Regions:
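Non-catalytic terminal extensions of PLP-dependent enzymes
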Residues: 2-75, 91-131, 143-159, 165-171, ...
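TRNA-binding/sensing appendages of the translation machinery
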Residues: 80-97, 320-325, 764
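Short, surface-exposed loop/turn segments at secondary-structure boundaries that line and modulate
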Residues: 95-107, 200-213
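Conserved PLP-enzyme active-site core in the AAT-like
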Residues: 172, 202-370, 432, 436, ...
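A conserved hydrophobic secondary-structure block that centers on an alpha-helix together
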Residues: 183-204, 218, 222
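A structural preference for short, hydrophobic beta-strand core positions in alpha/beta folds
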Residues: 194, 249, 302, 441-442, ...
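Proline/glycine-anchored alpha-helix kink/cap motifs
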Residues: 208-216, 238, 395-407, 826, ...
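Conserved phosphate/anionic-ligand binding catalytic regions in large, soluble enzymes, centered on
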Residues: 332-345, 349-350, 394-398, 479, ...
Length: 1022
């Protein structure tokens, strides 16, 4: 009898958290070791029972995380012809890169139970000091409506779904993202907005690249006002290098007028970036500058604030071409840097160059309106090195939160929130000036810059529990938000009074001051900001004006959720996407205010908890990759690629090898690889892939030798994107090293490496990891993501830095993202996942993921062509099925994908990495019953194809060609050559539990030809 993998028979140590009861802490003197080798262990049973050691916790995570039960794993092994999991792994993972059994200590990462993890997470959270942060700088506190917090952020129906490439089963979140686009378009006054970007800094960088591209790359100067957010300026400088753009930072307001600097060649200006309101809080009339820039053929970019835009003129009204910013203050807390959804809106002339994902309206096969991703041919997975951006992951979940915030409050509610914030800022302005201080900015919305002895003011503020912005020794800044109360205003004014050596104002006096200023409740709604007052209407669409009670919004949220297939519904077998369990225990820390309410620029002595968690996660990831150091800053896999290549670029430049700019990339690589290489200023040279999916070493050697003096790097994904390990990865990496290049190992498929092999043993210099794949951060319907990089020791000095908090090495490159540690709040999820599994749990997860994929490959190999297998006939963690042979019967990849929806599944990855392929990945979390259900679906679809082949069904009118089938299609006239029952209940079990797609197959061509990217009434689309 084969038992659960040896990884489950490891010995782990119980570590009592500091906050545990005394009785638990007593175990420190006599450590308890968990012995998991006996048949009585709960991991080996369907139901937990007493183990040999009564002190062992029963809420261990591994047995909940792994889908197949031990007897089912034995069945899978027997089916595949193996007597043990170790024998299977030895035949799957190439020996030359396989980690020796004892290469990593059992105690390198000690597993905690779910309750121990919760206790440890709370202990760390309590080390973060809960001061009120009025720092601003693009990050503000917000009141998250509980109905949105509970039913979107904390709802697996929203956070476990994938990017909506399969539009028929994504109508709910597509509608919500369309609401987001409409919200941004309306408030910015521009013509079209995308469905979110990663953060404000990277959005501004995308705008800079768009402006550069609009001149066909002929103009190389991008002018930035000195009062743009400092982190944005740093991100721009880092991004500009690869494109040869010169970022010029200058004061663009002189003598009270906005104008271009005299010392910059006007003929070379591609665009200008201004902040509105600026970092100091000032509102500037940018219209004269806009006219000047446009007269030169340049592009004007405005970084702006959505809440302020409910009161001040929109960028579109004063002539901006692009508006970017952060929508976090619409119901998404700062999270020590994120995640929050950045927005990006453009004028009509730029709509086909807009980066990121774009939601549009099309129609389905029945002529009904339906939502879809529009203009997908712009995206990097299609255009590769010709793409204008490498953006892949965005911030869909957070964009949906912000959209729901706007839906809940509506235009009137948003205006009221903004007016209250502005009124409180006026009151603070008056009180501070009454104390003898001078406020530097005359026109403002929510931010003030005050001339003062900064050291004294900051000391007084911190003692009052308040953080202010560090501007200079002679100035401090403050920024108010919707969470501010009378108590906060009293404490804030009191701190300035204390610093001035004066008596503080009482709360009653502050209330009296508000009345003197005419700022009572009845007048706030009619407040205006002189000279900048917005008169145009916004958010007039029905969706923003009808769901203002909690019951209404709750039902609206759930009506959208019901239209989408998520992991709460079924398996999502997307190859190269790793849709594994996002456990409740991993997600719980995210909801704690000690994590999500922290400002990213809070003093480091106030965030000791975050620093401890970040340090532990960096250490764990270094252990897993075998590399020397890790940066958690990149907030997507694509950003990780750019970061890793930029680190390589900096290292080579420091060696004086600036001529090295060639990047060798296999033709089978994901499209982000060539797009990222181009962004990093490299020239892409493709390397051939052999018919068996392996890299052609002869071609690699020839091209590495040919470009020996110019070779900078190679980018290789291991296992390959075709679903197999490379047999000679060490040899391939040595070829590159021998010719002076660095090896970038794309971590997209790290799922098949963890604790079995690693980038270091293969010889990689740098890798990125997708925490939203391998380490269980949810995909969120298209983001958030985290893409940290690990580097070898020689690259450590070049890890990304930051202008506010020092990160990275002594020769740090410019920041990749706006926040020092990226989307820090969701690092808690990956940290929890790793800590609950421990080293051996991680190993077991990888083993079972490999096993599940090979089981599916074995079960369907006689019905479909499994395109690639490894040396011993196995695949890695995913399998590529080639359905080209069915085209002669009129059946395409997309036909099979849509038919799988009728069986209750999300389709696999379609038409990639080959156009006729289905890339299937089965994670370790999927129950054996669900795996069997998928196998049965493929078997029955093969039978349906056989009926077409035999002439029993016409090629153009069958259950595959007409899939997916909706309830509406059943209730109408039925003239199809197959029964309704076969259409929607191809297996009996679907009668008891069926996911019904809300629309039939969508017409993509019609949607792109008739581009509509904002919401309205259904009648408008008909």
């Amino acid at each position: 009898m084969v038992t659960f993998p040896s990884a489950l028979r490891a010995i782990s140590r119980v570590r009592a958290p500091r906050t545990a009861p005394l009785s638990m802490n007593m175990t420190r003197a006599m450590p308890i070791r968990r012995t998991l080798a006996t048949s009585k262990d709960p991991l080996f049973l369907e139901t937990p029972n007493a183990s040999d050691d009564v002190f062992q916790p029963l809420d261990t995570f591994l047995r909940r995380h792994i889908g197949p039960r031990p007897h089912e794993i034995n069945h899978i092994l027997k089916t595949l012809g193996y007597s043990s999991i170790d024998e299977f792994v030895d035949q799957t993972v190439p020996e030359e890169v396989r980690l020796p059994k004892n290469a990593v200590s059992d105690d390198a990462i000690v597993a905690l139970s779910e309750s121990e993890l919760a206790s440890r997470g709370g202990e760390i959270a309590n080390k973060n000091k809960s001061l009120r942060s009025f720092i601003g700088m693009g990050y503000n506190n917000t009141t998250v409506p509980p109905v949105v917090m509970r039913n979107v952020l904390e709802n697996p129906g929203w956070y476990t779904s994938y990017t909506p490439y399969q539009a028929e089963i994504s109508q709910g979140r597509l509608e919500s993202l369309l609401n987001y686009q409409t919200m941004v378009k309306s408030l910015t006054g521009l013509d079209i907005a995308n469905a979110s970007l990663l953060d404000e800094g990277t959005a501004a960088a995308e705008a800079m690249i768009l402006a550069h591209g609009s001149t066909n790359g002929k103009k190389h100067t991008f002018v930035v006002d000195e009062n743009v957010l400092p982190q944005t300026i740093s991100v721009l400088r880092g991004r500009a290098k690869g494109f040869g753009i010169n970022v010029v930072v200058r004061p663009l307001v002189r003598d009270g007028n906005a104008q271009l600097p005299a010392d910059v060649s006007a003929e070379d200006i591609s665009g200008v970036l201004v902040q509105y309101p600026d970092v100091n809080g000032s509102l500037v009339d940018w219209e004269p500058l806009v006219k000047e820039v446009k007269g030169l053929g340049g592009t004007v970019v405005a970084a702006t604030d959505l809440l302020a835009l409910t009161m001040i003129r929109s960028p579109g009204e004063w002539g901006a071409d692009i508006a970017v910013g952060n929508s976090g203050r619409f119901g998404v807390p700062p999270g020590f840097g994120g995640p929050q959804a950045a927005f990006f809106a453009v004028s009509d002339s730029l709509k086909r160059r807009i980066p990121g994902r774009l939601i549009g309206v099309s129609r389905d096969a029945n002529g009904r309106p339906a939502y879809r991703l529009a203009l997908q041919t712009r995206e990097q997975h299609i255009r590769r090195e010709k793409a204008t951006s490498n953006i892949c992951t965005a911030q869909a979940l957070l964009a949906n939160m912000s959209a729901m915030y706007a839906v809940y409050h509506g235009p009137v509610g948003l205006r009221r929130i903004a007016a209250r914030v502005h009124a409180l800022t006026r009151i603070v302005h008056a009180e501070i000036e009454a104390l003898g201080y001078h406020v530097s900015n005359k026109n403002f919305f929510d931010t003030l810059t005050i001339a003062a002895n900064a050291e004294k003011v900051h000391a007084a503020a911190v003692s009052a529990g308040i953080n202010l912005r560090h501007v200079s020794p002679e100035h401090v800044g403050l920024s108010l938000d919707e969470t501010v109360t009378l108590k906060d205003v009293h404490a804030l004014v009191g701190a300035f009074a204390q610093a001035a050596g004066k008596t503080g104002t009482t709360s009653e006096q502050i209330v009296a001051r508000s009345r003197e200023l005419g700022l009572d409740a009845s007048s706030v709604d009619t407040l205006e900001i002189g000279g900048f007052n917005r008169t145009s209407k916004y958010l007039e669409q029905p969706v923003f004006n009808k769901y203002h009670s909690e019951t209404d919004l709750l039902r609206y949220i759930h009506s959208l959720q019901a239209k989408d297939l998520s992991l709460t519904t079924a398996m999502i077998p997307l190859g190269s996407c790793t849709m594994k369990l996002n456990s409740t225990s991993s997600m719980q820390l995210l909801s704690k205010p000690e994590y999500h309410a922290v400002h990213p620029f809070a003093p480091l002595d106030q965030v000791e908890g975050y620093m401890e968690l970040i340090s532990e996660l960096e250490r764990d990831l270094a252990t897993i990759t075998g590399l020397a150091a890790v940066s958690l800053q990149p907030n997507s896999g694509a950003q990780g690629e750019f970061a890793g290549l930029s680190v390589i670029r900096a290292y080579l430049d420091a060696k004086g090898e600036t001529q090295r700019n060639v990047c060798l990339i296999p033709s089978s690589a994901h499209g982000t690889n060539p797009a990222s290489a181009v962004m990093a200023g490299m020239k892409v040279v493709p390397v051939k892939t052999l018919p068996d999916g392996q890299i052609c070493l002869d071609d690699l050697r020839a091209k590495a030798t040919k470009h020996k003096n110019e070779l900078a790097a190679t980018m290789i994904t291991e296992p390959a994107t075709v679903g197999v390990y490379f047999n000679k990865s060490k040899e391939a990496f040595n070829i590159v090293h021998e010719n002076g290049g660095q090896v970038y190992l794309d971590g997209a498929n790290l799922q098949a490496q963890v604790a079995l092999t690693n980038p270091a043993i293969m010889g990689a210099d740098v890798t990125h990891l997708n925490l939203h794949k391998t380490f269980s951060i949810p995909h969120g319907g298209g983001g958030p993501g985290v893409g940290p990089i690990g580097v070898a020791a020689h690259l450590k000095p070049y890890l990304p830095g930051h202008p506010i908090h020092a990160t990275g090495g002594e020769h740090a490159i410019e920041p990749i993202t706006a926040a020092p540690w990226g989307s820090a709040s969701i690092l808690t999820i990956a940290w929890a996942y790793i800590r609950m599994l421990g080293w051996h749990g991680l190993r077991t997860s990888t083993q079972v993921a490999l096993l599940n994929a090979n089981y599916v490959a074995d079960r369907i190999k006689d019905l479909y062509k499994v395109k690639y297998v490894g040396k011993h006939g196995n695949v890695a963690h995913e399998l590529l099925v080639d359905v080209a042979e069915f085209s002669q019967y009129g059946v395409t990849v997309m036909d099979i994908a849509k038919r799988l929806i009728d069986y209750g599944f999300h389709p696999p990855t379609c038409s990639w990495p080959i156009s006729t392929g289905l890339l299937i990945e089965i994670t370790e979390s999927e129950p054996f019953s669900e795996i069997e259900r998928l196998v049965e679906a493929f078997r029955l679809i093969a039978e349906e194809i056989q009926e077409i082949k035999d002439g029993k069904l016409p090629k153009d009118n069958n259950m595959i060609k007409n899939a997916p089938h909706t309830i509406e299609s059943l209730t109408g006239e039925w003239d199809r050559p197959y029964s309704r029952e076969r259409a929607v209940y191809p297996v009996p079990a679907l009668r008891a539990n069926k996911f019904w797609p809300p629309v039939s197959r969508i017409d993509d061509v019609f949607g792109d030809r008739n581009l509509v990217c904002e919401c309205g009434s259904v009648e408008e689309y008909a």
